[in-house]
């Protein structure tokens, strides 16, 4: 199992905090956000993590790279660093880690701090984790059918579609399927 963490954004909404440290490395209760994120995911997966691939901006520097690799190693995984030096969207960020896009993987955006109970159906081809929210118009939301399958995904709906907000964590039984679509 792999975890892919796109985190090259500049964190402009959290300035001045992000002037000296990338947003995913801001400590919360003594640990960087990204560290908490990968620990939570590893706990849910209940299987060894082979690799954690971090997609960062080159300007983050060598110290950040070393810190990220150390986070991966604490979980018994290989830490890999990829670069996204131009903001060309989330699909592009994922493709920056194309050499790691094979086999089962979780893609997790490190720009949202959320505490949630995760569950993984490893028989599913893919999973999008969601959380019930009070203001769905502020988020991307999913609409489910009776079998709990996603039938619609709407970004910041003007009218009510659902109160299940996408939290930025996705599982793929074979992430190469996503790679081929990007």
Predicted regions and their residues:
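Hydrophobic alpha-helical segments, principally membrane-spanning helices and signal/leader peptides
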Residues: 14-15, 96, 153, 158
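Conserved core of the sugar-phosphate nucleotidyltransferase
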Residues: 113-182
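Short, solvent-exposed amphipathic alpha-helical segments in soluble enzyme
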Residues: 20, 69-71, 122-123, 144
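Short acidic donor-binding/metal-coordinating loop in glycosyltransferase active sites
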Residues: 110
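Conserved N-terminal catalytic core of the sugar/cofactor nucleotidyltransferase
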Residues: 2-8, 13, 19, 26-27, ...
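Glycine-rich, flexible loop/turn motifs
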Residues: 10-13, 21-24, 78, 90, ...
């Amino acid at each position: 199992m792999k975890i892919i963490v796109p985190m090259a954004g500049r964190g402009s909404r959290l300035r001045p905090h992000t002037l000296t440290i990338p947003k995913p490395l801001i400590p919360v209760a003594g640990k960087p956000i990204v560290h908490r994120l990968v620990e939570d995911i590893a706990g849910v997966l209940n299987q060894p993590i082979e690799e954690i691939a971090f997609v960062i901006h080159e300007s983050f520097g060598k110290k950040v790279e070393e810190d990220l690799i150390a986070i991966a190693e604490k979980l018994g995984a290989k830490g890999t660093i990829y670069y996204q030096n131009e903001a060309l969207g989330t699909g592009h960020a994922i493709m920056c880690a194309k050499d790691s896009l094979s086999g089962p993987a979780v893609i997790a955006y490190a720009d949202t701090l959320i505490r949630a109970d995760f569950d993984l159906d490893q028989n599913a081809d893919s999973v999008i984790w969601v959380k019930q929210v009070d203001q769905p118009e502020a988020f991307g939301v999913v609409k489910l059918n009776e079998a709990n399958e996603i039938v619609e995904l709407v970004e910041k709906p003007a009218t009510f579609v659902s109160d299940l907000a996408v939290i930025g964590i996705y599982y793929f039984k074979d992430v190469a399927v996503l790679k081929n679509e990007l």
